[in-house]
């Protein structure tokens, strides 16, 4: 019985030590676009109105075996609360198609995280509302 408890304890420890997710983010590893970042931003501005676009990259390793590479796009939009959910969904479809058409090394990316943010600052108080949508690229 003592050996069984020891075996069970060690098995449980090994299980929980191996089941973890590590997310790495690098600010200097921006993805490349066929038309450059500024050109990509201009093409998106033709479709819909936003104040600022931030582009980033992330890598997630799950259980040490599978790896997920993704693209982060954050759009600063005024009056986000007035935009309907169906319009947000149509925006994400357009953004996904533009990314597929303009992203270099598309096969290296699995997902795109699209975030729409509205920031309101009053004195020391900063309030951020956001909508986050994850779409598969391939």
Question: Which stretches of residues belong to each language-model region?
Answer:
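C-terminal motif of bacterial Sec signal peptides marking the signal peptidase cleavage site
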Residues: 15-18
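Short, non-transmembrane amphipathic alpha-helical segments
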Residues: 84-107
């Amino acid at each position: 019985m003592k050996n069984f408890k020891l075996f069970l304890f060690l098995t449980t420890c090994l299980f929980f030590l191996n089941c973890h997710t590590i997310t790495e983010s690098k600010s200097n590893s921006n993805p490349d676009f066929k038309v450059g970042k500024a050109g990509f931003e201009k093409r998106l501005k033709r479709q819909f109105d936003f104040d600022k676009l931030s582009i980033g990259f992330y890598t997630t390793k799950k259980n040490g075996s599978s790896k997920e590479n993704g693209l982060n796009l954050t759009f600063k939009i005024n009056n986000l609360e007035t935009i309907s959910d169906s319009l947000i969904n149509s925006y994400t479809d357009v953004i996904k198609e533009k990314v597929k058409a303009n992203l270099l090394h598309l096969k290296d990316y699995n997902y795109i995280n699209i975030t729409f943010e509205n920031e309101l600052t009053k004195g020391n108080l900063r309030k951020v509302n956001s909508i986050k949508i994850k779409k598969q690229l391939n």
